Every structure is written in structure tokens, then in C-alpha cells.
Amino acid sequence: LIQTNAETVNRLLKIGVLSKPGLSYIICLSHEDVLNSPIERDKKAVQLIKVGLMQYLIKIQKEAINENSIAATVARTFIKSNVNDEIVIYSFNYTSFGAIAPNSSFAMEFNDAVKYVHGLCLDGNIILGTRDENIDKNYDFIQKSFDSQYNPPAMVYDLMDADDITIFGHSLGINDSQYFKAFFERQSSSTNPQKKNITIFTKDAKSEIEIKRSLQEMTNWNLTSLYGLNNLQIIKTDECVNNPTLLRKYIKMYVDNEEDIDSIIHI
């Protein structure tokens, strides 16, 4: 085996075009690939990364989830919610909700409600790449929308149509901005304003700043208007651990009964 493409792959990983969370795979191409053009070798390298990522995720998704986590608490809130029948969940993960939480208290509840934006590793059809950009046409293959299996659900429409939106653990970074920009742009405009409840869960103060920077760009630097025209809150999960009141306030937006709220927080 000849490692002909390591430099290119490492460059793509470094600039965020590709990602390999927790992977330590070595990208190796067969001898005949030396005769191929650099573009063809890059295509094959991307496919190798995709296969390696799917293998890794299939392995780790068998691990049990923490039922006491903030994410699990939010999921239980949706189950007890007075708008349960109207919930739609969009997952940007490649792992199946049912597979990672087969024995959880909420896995079956959401089985039909979850839509996978970038495919599922169990189906072997994950979408890996960048957002739409004006790049060298020979490298169109690294853009998500050029993948022959790319067929995302109507998330943008549902965001526009929803009254309550909860975003959990997503950085709202540039690579997925095409799914969010139109929504946040509209919600920060005073033209025909429609007030919505928007809650964003993130880890800590550092990630909160990064999210606000992304929101600034997506609202054309009208973040103040986004706050003023909506009920927008950013909840830091690290703070929820020591201050359950923050989480209780969120749960009360959707659940009225105090006993139900207690059961959601304390399983």
C-alpha cells in the first residue's frame, strides 16, 4: 500500500472540509491509484474517510446513553409536552436514535418523529462534505449537494412554520448555515414579524460566543433584532448541572404539571 494522499486529506481535515471525530485511521491507496490523477485520488480518499467514519460510528453507537444527561431530560420534556403530536426532530448525527437508545424511556416515542438530515451510517448513505460554494468544478464532489444520495428533509420549511424551536448541541457553524440562514434572517427582520420561542442549548460560555457569532452572520448583523422580535434564550448545559432552575424554566414552557416536571428532571 502506498500512502499517496495523506497530505491532501490532512489539509481537508485541517480546514474543516472533512472531519474524523475520534478516528485514527490511516488513509492508504492501492498501487494502481498512483497512475490516477490527483483529483481521482482525492475522490477515493474522501470515500475512504466516509467508510472509516461509518465503521467508527456503528461501533460507538452501541454504547449506552446517560439517562440523566441534559439531552435526555430535554427528550423527556418533549414526551410530556402538551404539543407532543406536533413534534418533529431533525438530527444532524449519522447515528440512529433507536440504535443509540434502544432501552431508553423515550427511544420508541420518537422513532417516527426523527428525520436524519445527512443520512444514517446503518443505511450506508451518509452525506459528508461542505456547503454550496463557488469552488473549482473538479472538486464539486466535496459539496454535500452534489452527492447522488443527497435528499434532505424539508427542514427549512418546518423551521419557518414552527412556533417553538429547540436547537440542542449544534454549533450553527458555516458548514450547515444553508439550513438555518433563511430562518434566522427572517426572524430578525421587522417586515411581517412572527414571534417564535427559540431555545439553543450549548455547552458553556465559550460555545455561546461562537453561536452568537454565527447568529450575527446569519442575521446580517442584526442579532439585537433577533432577540427583540423573538423569545430567544441560550442555555448553557454546564450551568444547568449546578443550577436546575435554568432547566426547569425551559421545561415549564411545554409542561404545566409540577409532578410531571419533577419526573422529567429526576428519573
Model-predicted regions and their roles:
Residues 1-161:
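Extended, H/D-rich, highly charged conserved domains that either
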Residues 105-106, 154-267:
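SIR2/sirtuin-family catalytic core signature
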